[in-house]
Amino acid sequence: MTIDTKFEHSPLLYLKKASGLLSNPVSAAEGRDMIIRTLDNRELYKNYEILLKHLVRKAGLYPYLNTEFKNHDLEDIISIEANKPNLNNDIVFHAIQTRVFNELLSGKNVVLSAPTSMGKSEIISNILTPERYRTVVLIVPTIALIDETRKKLVVMLGEQYRIIHHNSQSHDEHEPAIFILTQERFNQRKDLEKIDLFIIDEFYKLGFKYDKDGVLKYDERAISLNISLSQLLKRSKQWFFIGPNITSVKGLFSLVGDFTFICSNFRTVSVDVKEYNIPATDTDRKKEVLLEILNECKDEKTIVYCRSPNAANKLAQFLMSGASFEASYNDEFIDWLSKNYDPRWNYCQSLKHGIVLHHGVLPRALQHFSVDIFNRSRRHNLLICTSTIIEGVNTKAKNVIIYENYNGLESIDKFTHNNIKGRAGRMYKHFVGKVYCLQAQPEEDDSDELVVPIGDDGSNCPLNLLGSIDIDHLSSGALSSWEDFKKTTIIPIEIIRNNSSFEVEKIESLLIEINSVRVMDFSLYKKLNFFGKPTTEALYFIMVQFIAARKNVLTRNGFSVTSKNDKDPVLSICGKFRAYIAAESVDDYLTQQMNWKYNKLIESQNDKQEIDEQMSGVIDDELKIISNVYGFSFPNFLSLFSDILFHLNFKEKTGLKFDYGPLINDMEFQKLTAGYAAIHEMGIPHQTLEKIRKELININESSVEELSEAINEKYHSIVSLNRVDRYFIHAAML
């Protein structure tokens, strides 16, 4: 929507129209949108300040009443004070924030579906007090969101609560605490029996997805979140669900009874949407239009959404090849990237040209830096990113360009498309954002309707989910299915519950394979019972089973699992894993892999540009493997393997002992101790942490708090740290 030309020379007529729309609940959103646009064109309405102020108040936009107008009358003051969540607070809520706050304050359970710009985090930070909620659990979908939320709550509530964001941190039930965890981390904790309030952010992720034929897509993360929901409902006094663009919720009432569902389209910024309807395959036309838009918005903060990190890299390379983005930026951060990664890396080259990349492959520290430099640098007005745009990235972008309607290989639905569009504009910064859709918008569908699987009839719930939720949350049909399964399965139920992300069929298959080795090849079975690092034979067997259980994970992250030229792919994968296991640090591993790849490229070709591009790809590929495979999927699988091995040893009285714990931790914590791994998640890169570790001696490396305190106290005096290292530390430690 834009201000209609017939109103341009009649501000009074425009305000009268807006007032009429605001008076009708059906059209109030349109009236509010008109009022926000007047704030973006204040000069036109300078003669109608009192009327405009009245309409801002009528629209429920009390924060703007507080910040955009100087002369407040009694009615203004009453409205402002009535919408402050706490006495003497500088925060002023808008109408929907106040409604949600009051519902929670009265002890009700609330499901809130509202736009991204609605200000949900302000509700959380203002509702929480130790007197009201002593133990709070906040479930967020990603580690990136853990850190974004941690930073906000440390500033707002750090003196009142202990903020627990990593499972290496213990909990004293007598101490007020806020847990910020992914669903997987919550499910691992055994110290949260009594909870006063739990919050699920992005609650729409509870729902299962289906392919075009109606077949369930197996989603281990949705399963984990439903398990968390079941456990939290049994342990918590009150709950609050937050997310965007959901119009109905099915299956929740049967679990919890009464709750308040607030579905609001209340926005604090307006958005203009322009559609180009370019066919997905017409890349030349899309690039042409993209250049036109970027030229039009060259002095404004603009986000371009792409389907994948590879697509983002290619688009950045295309823009760098033109005249609009010259390599004019060079500073000590570029030098740091060149030294610690490679000067040929596309992330580094893009920054030189004023282009910022942001995607899930990047280490946490660089993701933070990308957002920071985009928000504050006048030379970096373009951010090219992937679905990370809707996973905890808060920017000052005025414009969003949706370059393609895909997330990876899959088309995005209307829900996700709306979520991306919601990133345009920023309260107090840009009253009106702009969205450019290069392809046609997705058709209307039911993606805005959430069905909570464990509260539905349970017929579509995998057995590993049914076995891991509270029995009171099973429907009669689901309970019958679970009881029938228990009568015939060879898997101990505790193994299913401890490894709930794995389908029971895969757990059973792995148990059979390991037991077969015990029976047929006991010498190999003994080698599986290792301490420290596996032998070549043990690693090979483990890898065969890992491929069988997580083939899609490996192929998605660049591993070839099929034979080529009579070469055994398992040997190749084992070699790569062995190199990582043997490496002293992530930095050492990266250097080894890059040197190996560079030597192979030099042997096979002489084209420097091709070599440079491939070397850039090597860094991205390895970072993705480190994060997704070494750091998550493989240690997760080793935990399952270990549980089965322990079960067989106990059942068959083999007398064998083993300990996979050190290897699992070494993989999961990316060559760091538990405490340093938590610090790394906060945004300090491996390279900087290695310098710190050499200086901080006689300290408990498993304690996040002790390490944080020591780093904050001593990093200024550590000579080996340069200004870039100190930037990362300061940004992470606040």
PLM regions and their residue ranges:
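N-terminal helicase ATP-binding lobe
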Residues: 1-734
